């Protein structure tokens, strides 16, 4: 079992608060600041030469490092700004308005993804109640199945395999959103067999914002041609040719100038996740979340997250009389967490491998006190924040 004492000094914010919001913005590794200084040094001292000394290749080289964590082959992951951009690029591979125009996903999908597909006039969106209903909703009219590996509100792990199997039978493509699983739940993108996967670095990967990513299964990459592209997608970008010739593999899913500083920061998170190992992180996470659920039961707090370990990601969501008010009061008590609205909502607590059992116990104890004493009532009307 991981000893958090070995890692806590690498995450400066842990000295100032009880930080249990790693499902939203994980604690920053101190090494990220060092990496950003190196970025600034390169820009200052090397100027434009930095592009040829690593910057230009970062969308692929950083993706390759992430691929080692996610079980993806080299060259199959490229870095983007965020998940919405990545999924829009995937969508651009397909002509809209034909008979195969259905998008099937679960109602609990993250809103940003839903907005993207709802905004397309040529698509028919089918939202089903849960993951068990997705496979049944897939038919020969289905184009894409954008699903979450772990639901953002309550941390429930979705059963991906039957969905992938049914989509393949029907000729549809699966886009797996791994934002809430990457870095805390072990999996292999190769073994899952999904066509595409997306995610970001801001959560369990400890990589900060602006480093989203897109995985394209190698055989899929070679037969698709996205239309939302830029010069990085060209086979010879510095030839500045007037016509597009697609690069090989996932490179053809790139756009324009990469977000270099965000990629510098992200590698600091990837380094520590690789060092600790996702299986070890998962073991620690399950111990934390099981302890948290038991403490909530003892305190009479209602847990919304799955109780079965195999169905639970890294987050425990606890229902309260007033989520916003309880969240505000927890913040005043030095506990950094967040909340999401119902249904399936509540206070979200996301301990990572560097958190301690004492922090878990403290957070649940304070939440129980806030609910039992009605202390949250003085915060009623608190604005929703992140």
PLM features per residue range, with description:
Residues 1-386:
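Pyridoxal 5′-phosphate
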